[in-house]
Amino acid sequence: MAGSALAVRARFGVWGMKVLQTRGFVSDSSDSMDTGAGSIREAGGAFGKREKAEEDRYFREKTKEQLAALRKHHEDEIDHHSKEIERLQKQIERHKKKIQQLKNNH
């Protein structure tokens, strides 16, 4: 009984305290973000347009990088599978030769 009580207290006491501590320090930031204060993009104008253009350029560049990485991955896969096909074809030929040798010997 004493052992299980210690285990329960250790499990819930320590973890419960950490949960309470982390919950106590967290602020609800959704209230402060609703005002949009300081957001250049929401203000509109030249700065908002410039920021949108920079974001668009960034995402186009990231998409281009991802497509290049995907293209390289597929090329590597094709190369790997081509080599695997060649290896398997050589095995098939080797087995066919063994079968032919067995037929010739008997």
From Swiss-Prot:
Q: What GO terms are given for molecular function?
A: angiostatin binding; ATPase binding; ATPase inhibitor activity; calmodulin binding; identical protein binding; mitochondrial proton-transporting ATP synthase complex binding
Query: Coiled coil located at which positions?
Result: 60-106
Q: Which residues carry this modification: N6-succinyllysine?
A: K103
Query: What residues span the transit peptide?
Result: 1-25
Where can this protein be found? Mitochondrion
Q: What is its main location?
A: mitochondrion
Spans of biased composition, class Basic and acidic residues?
48-58
Protein origin, superkingdom:
Eukaryota
Which residues belong to the signal peptide in this entry? Answer: none
Which residues, renumbered to this chain, carry the PTM Phosphoserine?
A: S39
Q: Where is this region: N-terminal inhibitory region?
A: 26-52
Q: Which InterPro entries match?
A: ATPase_inhibitor_mt
Role noted for this protein: Endogenous F(1)F(o)-ATPase inhibitor limiting ATP depletion when the mitochondrial membrane potential falls below a threshold and the F(1)F(o)-ATP synthase starts hydrolyzing ATP to pump protons out of the mitochondrial matrix. Required to avoid the consumption of cellular ATP when the F(1)F(o)-ATP synthase enzyme acts as an ATP hydrolase. Indirectly acts as a regulator of heme synthesis in erythroid tissues: regulates heme synthesis by modulating the mitochondrial pH and redox potential, allowing FECH to efficiently catalyze the incorporation of iron into protoporphyrin IX to produce heme.
Entry domain remark: Forms an alpha-helical dimer with monomers associated via an antiparallel alpha-helical coiled coil composed of residues 74-106, leaving each N-terminal inhibitory region (residues 26-52) accessible for interaction with an F1 catalytic domain. The inhibitory N-terminal region (residues 26-52) binds the alpha(ADP-bound)-beta(ADP-bound) (ATP5F1A-ATP5F1B) interface of F1-ATPase, and also contact the central gamma subunit (ATP5F1C).
Q: Subunit structure, per the record?
A: Homodimer; represents the active form and is present at a pH value below 6.5. Homotetramer; represents the inactive form and is present at a pH value above 7.0.
Q: Which family does it belong to?
A: Belongs to the ATPase inhibitor family.
Name-wise, this protein is ATPase inhibitor, mitochondrial
Starting at the broadest rank, the lineage of the source organism is:
Eukaryota, Metazoa, Chordata, Craniata, Vertebrata
